[in-house]
Amino acid sequence: MVKKIGVLTSGGDAPGMNAAVRGVVRTALTEGLEVFGIHDGYLGLVEDRIEKLERHSVSDMINRGGTFLGSARFPEFKEVAVREKAIENLKKHDIDALIVIGGDGSYMGAKKLTEMGYPCIGLPGTIDNDIAGTDYTIGYLTALNTVIDAIDRLRDTSSSHQRISIVEVMGRHCGDLTLMSAIAGGCEYVITPETGLNKEALIQNIQDGIAKGKKHAIIAITELMTDVNQLAKEIEAETGRETRATVLGHIQRGGQPGAFDRILASRMGNYGVKLLIDGHGGRCVGIQNEQLVHHDIIDAIENMRRPEKLELYKVAEELF
């Protein structure tokens, strides 16, 4: 029977992580459990940065961006000896189970602990929206609004100067944030890992638009696909139209979470605790068709795939 649980945030931060921690803490205390916050992710777990949390510990946190527990990337957690040290620290505090809030790397750590017999629950916290088994991740929709706001501002100046603007959006190997922001921001072109980058076709499309009287354009592209500053130079050389690249970077991770992310994070935090109380371990939480669900975390990482957004790409193509 679970009496004490730990909670940590890991990997890249996302708006709504604090709301998720709050959901975990308040639910656990209401259910008569003790809660321990682990600072700086798996690194803090190994280094025993663990403190008991009370209701007041998460007061005034639901509206704050970032994560008050701190986060860190800790690749050394892949090593068995390092994970054994982590479990040793959990046992030292009599912590029976762990809730991990983060992205795919964080899930991998929870998976490894699960395989070593330690019950973990994963909550999807990442702006990339790249986690299998959920329609939305905590922080994604807030980041989407941040990107759209930037695109709106770029459109103002691009139209004033008859300029082509390239906007680099986060997402790594997932184009969801780029695709949705391109549709909502009215971008003329969208390039994601799912579509690939065809420079010749892109430049030809831009030239065709100019020939039809297009005065300016915005291109949304997912990070890591190419050097956007070099791409801007190539487009300007081929089209004769001034072209500039804007890398939004880590601004996409910051800021107050929107209402949707606050509610989603609160629901997921509450649900994660209930799963542990019901005897479930080694699970990851998701939301599908507006319903909270849970999956085997090992199966989710190894076998589940995110559905392709073919309909949305078709919409984007027809609107652009």
From Swiss-Prot:
GO terms for cellular component: 6-phosphofructokinase complex. Allosterically activated by ADP and other diphosphonucleosides, and allosterically inhibited by phosphoenolpyruvate. Mg(2+) binds at residue 104. The active site is at 128 (proton acceptor). GO terms for molecular function: 6-phosphofructokinase activity; AMP binding; ATP binding; fructose-6-phosphate binding; identical protein binding; metal ion binding; monosaccharide binding. Belongs to the phosphofructokinase type A (PFKA) family. ATP-dependent PFK group I subfamily. Prokaryotic clade 'B1' sub-subfamily. NCBIfam families: PFKA_ATP, PRK03202.1. This is ATP-dependent 6-phosphofructokinase. The gene is pfkA.
